[in-house]
C-alpha cells in the first residue's frame, strides 16, 4: 500500500531576545534622512528592525515595507527640488540593502512569536503518530540559522518540554490503549554527527574514545548504523532519563551569536514493532521508525567570531547544510533530471529516505525576525519554499512471519480463551445493563447484537456444512498427492537400483518406466494446481462479512472481533486437516523399498554366481514391478523347479557333490529358506551304489495316483519379510580343504538334484544323503509300523512368499489380495515325517514300503542334524552286531 505525499513545511518565528529588544526601533517616525546609514547597515548592532511579519496561519512577509513610507512621500512633496533628489537617493540606497522588499511566502503552517510548544506539537508531530501506528515511517527535523530556536523547539526545557517529550508521551498513551489488541516492541537510539563523524550519545565518552560509527545500507535499502546502542524503555520516565543522558553527552559550546550553540546534528530514532495478539497462521508484523532530528545552525564566521577548532566545526556544519540545500534543489525538479548528491555528507545520507524516500516528513523552519540575521533568514525561507515541492512515495512496512506447525494448536487455544473472555464480558455487560434500569437503550442494543451474533453463527455453521464436499475433495486431493509422492519415490529408487545393479538390460522397458515416472509427475502437478483451500476460507468470510461491517458501523467492535475470531478458528480447523493429510504416514512405501533392495541384491548375487535361470526369473519380476504390472507369485515359484526338458548334458557329476562347510557362512539369525515338513511327494529308495550312498529321490512315482513333482508347486517359507539375499546358499567348502571324517554324513540341499539310477533322464529337486560307511546296513522293522507312519497326517503350516499383487505404482491404492495357499493342491496326499524314529524303524527291503513311499508327494525333514547323528549310531550298532 503506497501513498503520494509531500513534505510538510512549517515556519516558526522566534521572539526577539532581550538584547535585540533593547535595540529595536520602536516607531518609524524616529527615522530621518540622517539615520538612514544605520538602516543600510542592519548588522551594526545599534538599530534593529523586524524583517519577518506573519500575516495569518499560512502566509508571512519577509522584509515588509515600513509604515512611514507614505509619510515620507507626503513630506517630500513639501521639500525643495534638491531635498527631493536627496530623499530619492536615500530610498534607493536603502532598497539596495534589502529595505522594503515585501516578499510573501506561503507554507503549510506559520507560527508567530506567541505560539507555544503545545501548539507547535499539535500541528506538526501529532498527526504523524497515526502514521507510525499504521506502519509508516516519519521524520521531524528542525532547520534554520544558529540562534533561531531549533533546539528549544525539539528538546525544550523541564518547565516547557519540546517535541520529543510531547510526542513520546502521547505515543506511550496510545500504546497502553491498544495493548489488549496488539503486542508492542519499542527500541530507541540517539546519535550525533560531529565533524562528519557519528557518535553514540547513549554511551558515556571516555578518554580512549571508541572508533566512530559508520553508515550502512541493509538488504531493504534502509540506512542503518551498525554498533549503535539500542535500548527498550518500558515507561515514559525511562525515556526522559535516556534523552537527558544523550543531551548531556552532546557537543555544545558558546559562540558570539548563541550562548548555547549546538556543534553537531542530533538524531533520535524510535523503532516500533507491533503485531496483533490474535494473529493468524501467517503473522504480519508492522515496523515503523520515527526520527526526530535537531540540525546544527548555519553560521557566518564574521558574525560568530570563531577561531581554531570552533571555526573547523562551523565549516563542517556549513558543509553538511550546503549538501542538504543541494539535495533539496535537486529534489524540487519535477522531472528529476539532476543527480541528488546524497553522498556529499553523512547528514544527507541519513536523511535520504526522509527527503525522497519511504517516509512522511515534517520540516520545521526556525527563523529570527531580527534584521541582524537578514541574509540567513532570507536563504532559509528560500530553501523552505523549495522543499514544499518535494514528493515522496510512502509505503507501509509489513514483515510477514510464517508460524510453525506446532503453534497452530496454541493459537487455537488462545483464540478460544479470548472468545470465552469476551463472552464473559458480554455476560457482565448484560447483568449490569439489567441491573441499571435507566440504561434501557444499551440493553436493547446489546440484545440486538446478541441476536446478530447468533444469526452469524448459524450462517457459519450452514456454510461449514455446505462446504463439506469441497473440504473433503481438497483433503482427498492432498492425500492423492501424498500417494503420488510415494509412488514417484519408489519408481526413482527402482530406476537408480536397476541402472546401477543391472546395466544394459531391457533398455526399452527402462524407457517405459521413465515415461511412467514423467506421467506421474505430470498428474501430480495437475492435482496440485486444483488444490485451493482459499475457496473455502472466502466462503466463510463472505457469509458473515455483512454482519461484521454492521458491527463496525454501529461501533460494536467487540462483537465484530468475536465473530472474526470464530471465522479464523474454522480456517484453522481446515488448515489442520490439510496438514494431517500431508503428514500422513504410509508404511507401504518403506516395506516395498526394502523388498526392492533385497531383490536387487539377490539378482546381483545370482548373476555373479552363474545362476542364469534364477537371475532371469527375478529380473522379469523386477521389470514387472517397475512397469506397474501385477506379477503373479508363481513367477517366483518357478525358481525352485528344474527344467524337465533338459538333456543329458545337465546331469550332475556325482563325484562333485560337496558337503556343507564345517562353519556356517551365513548369520544364524537370518531366516531359513525351508521348514522341515511332512513329505508330499513320492520318495523312492534306490539301491545303494558301490560307494555306499543312500539316495532319497522324489522323482520316482509308482503310485496309482501318478502324482509328479511337475504337477504340484513347491512350498516355500512363510516369512513375511523374507528377502532373497537371506535365502541364498553360499558355496560349499572345496573337497581338498575339507577335513576327513569317516563317520560324517554330508547333507546338501540342491536346487538341481543328482540323477536317480532308476530315472536317469529326469533330474528333480531332492535331498542327497551320502555316507562313506564301508558296509551297507539295513534296518529291520515291521511294515505295519511304517504304514502307521504313512497314515499319520502331520500338521504343516501353509507358507507363501510376501504378496506382491498389492503393488500398484499407477498412483492409486489397491485393496489387499488374500495370500495364496499352495497346500490345497496336495491336500489329499498322505504326509510322512522323516525323523529319528522313522529312520530307526524303516525297512528299505520291503516292496510294500517302497510302494507306500512312492505315493508321497513331498519329503520333509524334522531335523537333519539329528538324522545324521542317529544314522551314525545305528550304523555303528549294526556293525558291532555283525562282527
From Swiss-Prot:
The source organism is Schizosaccharomyces pombe (strain 972 / ATCC 24843)
Question: Which gene produces this protein?
Answer: klp5
GO MF entries: ATP binding; ATP hydrolysis activity; microtubule binding; plus-end-directed microtubule motor activity
Identify the SMART domains for this entry.
Answer: KISc
Major location (coarse): cytoplasm
One GO-annotated biological process of the protein: mitotic spindle organization
Cysteine-cysteine disulfides: none
What's the protein here called?
Kinesin-like protein 5
Task: Extract the CDD domains matched here.
Answer: KISc_KIP3_like
GO CC, any one term: nucleus
Q: Which residues form a coiled coil?
A: 396-435, 563-588
Q: What happens when the gene is disrupted?
A: Simultaneous disruption of dam1 is lethal and leads to the cut phenotype (septation without chromosome segregation).
- Top-level taxonomic group: Eukaryota
| Region (Disordered), start-end ranges | 755-785
**Family assignment from sequence similarity:** Belongs to the TRAFAC class myosin-kinesin ATPase superfamily. Kinesin family. Kinesin II subfamily.
Q: Subunit structure of this entry? A: Heterodimer with klp6.
Does the entry feature the keyword Iron-sulfur, yes or no? no
The keyword Metal-binding is assigned to this record: no
Q: Where in the cell is it found?
A: Cytoplasm; Cytoplasm, Cytoskeleton; Chromosome, Centromere, Kinetochore; Cytoplasm, Cytoskeleton, Spindle
Described function? Has a role in establishing metaphase during mitosis. Required for chromosome segregation where it generates tension during kinetochore capturing.
